[in-house]
Curated annotation (Swiss-Prot):
<feature type="active site" description="Proton acceptor">
    <location>
        <position position="253"/>
    </location>
</feature>
<keyword id="KW-0547">Nucleotide-binding</keyword>
<dbReference type="GO" id="GO:0004672">
    <property type="term" value="F:protein kinase activity"/>
</dbReference>
<feature type="region of interest" description="Disordered">
    <location>
        <begin position="1"/>
        <end position="41"/>
    </location>
</feature>
<comment type="similarity">
    <text>Belongs to the protein kinase superfamily. Ser/Thr protein kinase family.</text>
</comment>
<keyword id="KW-0067">ATP-binding</keyword>
<protein>
    <recommendedName>
        <fullName>Putative serine/threonine-protein kinase F31E3.2</fullName>
        <ecNumber>2.7.11.1</ecNumber>
    </recommendedName>
</protein>
<dbReference type="InterPro" id="IPR008271">
    <property type="entry name" value="Ser/Thr_kinase_AS"/>
</dbReference>
<feature type="compositionally biased region" description="Basic residues">
    <location>
        <begin position="1"/>
        <end position="16"/>
    </location>
</feature>
<dbReference type="Pfam" id="PF00069">
    <property type="entry name" value="Pkinase"/>
</dbReference>
<feature type="domain" description="Protein kinase">
    <location>
        <begin position="126"/>
        <end position="381"/>
    </location>
</feature>
<keyword id="KW-0723">Serine/threonine-protein kinase</keyword>
<dbReference type="InterPro" id="IPR017441">
    <property type="entry name" value="Protein_kinase_ATP_BS"/>
</dbReference>
<feature type="binding site">
    <location>
        <position position="156"/>
    </location>
    <ligand>
        <name>ATP</name>
    </ligand>
</feature>
<dbReference type="GO" id="GO:0005524">
    <property type="term" value="F:ATP binding"/>
</dbReference>
<keyword id="KW-0808">Transferase</keyword>
<keyword id="KW-0418">Kinase</keyword>
Length: 441
């Protein structure tokens, strides 16, 4: 038959028989593991071996080195926006952060443009001296400028976390907007600048040097005031309230704690947290304010307008003379529990003051004093010339002034006026104290 060439099946030359491989292993001695992998996979294996080798050497050189483990959370493609701010996500609920001590480092856009992120004036320009008060969202400090320690200001620091958690973003922005757009008035505390950082909102406010504190502290320390002191305080606050009403602002929180006395005893209205833009002739129905100063119109849940501020002013004047509330509401904890019966008529006062209280605190709106024009013409304020009142030509009673300032000087007001005019652009009606410069957080 001859030599017949055996044909190989296609692909047989690519195979290495298992038996043949075992024979090679037996010939070499112990079985050896041979890597039959591609080049990329082999390179990856070599990198792992090299990493293990370096790690072992590092452990030998540094025996005190401890292995730290980190919990890697799955990335969420959606932005970390609270449910009550953006409702487009349906049933999406962001879990609570594990480290609550860290404040929220975002949401700058929520507070723009009332609180810009870049400002010439920032928290590093002042030295905090003492705490003046604490509010729902932060603290108010008395501060002095670094370049001039004698100039005093009030700096309000509000936490973004508290504002967002209590859903008060619009309220805080409304307060800052009203104060920034409001023109200057001698009996309203001015707002010089506002800005924000990653965690806080800041407001630079007027605070008179040598102030005796708020009206509540003065009344608590010195007791009931004389009618002469009450007359001037009432006239100055009435002028401030009428100025707000003329600028379509309803205040809604007139009380002793929101009035600060300067070193000479003149009144300054502060804290616009509950103020609201409201045009003349319009009405609103939000139930807000301090319970003991709340008018029947607000407590009943109906609609009301600017005239509720005059009721609150009447309660304030009544407390300054008698030391008690005009109605038995000192223990009330809800607006539904307020009682407007058993009116406490002031005793030991002049007939004019008693008549003023009767008219300002009348439950019926038809018999109540509800305008500045009527109050201006009341006999109790006959000795006050309201045209000269804003020039502070009247000297307050010595019982409410600061003994260290026995004479009145207008240099302080001149500095404040210059600063305010520099920071207020009448043409556009906006506070332009801040320029576009970086603030390093």
């Amino acid at each position: 038959m001859g030599n017949v060439a055996t044909r190989k099946r296609p692909g047989c030359h690519h195979h290495i028989g298992r038996n043949e491989e075992n024979l090679d292993d037996d010939e070499d001695g112990p079985a050896k593991k041979r890597l039959r992998i591609g080049e990329p996979q082999a390179e990856n294996e070599y990198q792992k071996l090299a990493f293990k080798s370096r790690l072992q050497k590092l452990k030998k050189c540094r025996p005190h080195l401890k292995r730290r483990t980190y919990k890697v959370e799955e990335a969420d493609p959606r932005p970390p926006v609270p449910r009550f701010i953006v409702d487009d996500y349906g049933d999406y609920e962001k879990p609570e952060p594990t480290r609550k001590e860290f404040a929220i480092p975002w949401f700058e856009h929520l507070f723009l443009p009332e609180f810009p992120t870049r400002s010439v004036i920032n928290e590093k320009s002042f030295v905090l001296e003492r705490q003046l008060g604490r509010g729902s969202f932060g603290v108010v400090y008395c501060a002095s400028a670094i370049h001039d320690s004698e100039r005093k200001f009030a700096i309000k620091m509000q936490e973004k976390r508290e504002i967002i958690s209590k859903r008060a973003v619009l309220q805080v922005k409304r307060e800052a907007s009203i104060q920034r757009l409001l023109p200057s008035h001698p009996f309203i505390a001015r707002t010089y600048s506002t800005w924000q950082t990653r965690t806080h909102l800041y407001s630079l406010l007027q605070y008179p040097t040598g102030s005796t504190g708020d009206l509540f502290s003065v009344w608590r320390q010195r007791g009931s005031l004389s009618e002469a002191a009450i007359r001037l305080i009432g006239a100055e606050l009435a002028s401030a309230i009428d100025f707000l009403h003329q600028n379509d602002v309803i205040y809604r929180d007139v009380k002793l704690e929101n009035v600060v006395l300067d070193q000479w005893g003149h009144a300054l209205l502060i804290d616009f947290g509950l103020a609201k833009k409201l045009k003349q002739g319009s009405s609103t129905g939000t139930i807000c304010g301090t319970l003991q100063y709340m008018s029947p119109d607000v407590a009943s849940g109906g609609t009301y307008s600017h005239y509720v501020d005059w009721w609150s002013l009447g309660v304030l004047l009544h407390i300054l003379l008698t030391g008690i509330y005009p109605y038995p509401n000192s223990e009330a904890t809800h607006h539904a529990n307020l009682k407007f019966i058993d009116y406490s008529t002031p005793i030991g006062c002049s007939r004019e003051f008693a008549n003023l209280m009767d008219r300002m605190l009348a439950v019926s709106i038809t018999h109540r004093l509800c305008s500045f024009t009527v109050l201006h013409a009341h006999p109790f304020f006959r000795s006050i010339d309201f045209s000269k009142l804003e020039q502070k030509d009247y000297t307050p009673a010595a019982e409410i002034g600061n003994a260290e300032y026995d004479t009145y000087h207008k240099s302080e007001d001149a500095l404040d006026d210059a600063l305010f005019k520099e920071n207020y652009d009448v043409s556009c009606g906006r506070n332009v104290i801040f320029a576009v410069l970086p603030v390093f957080w």
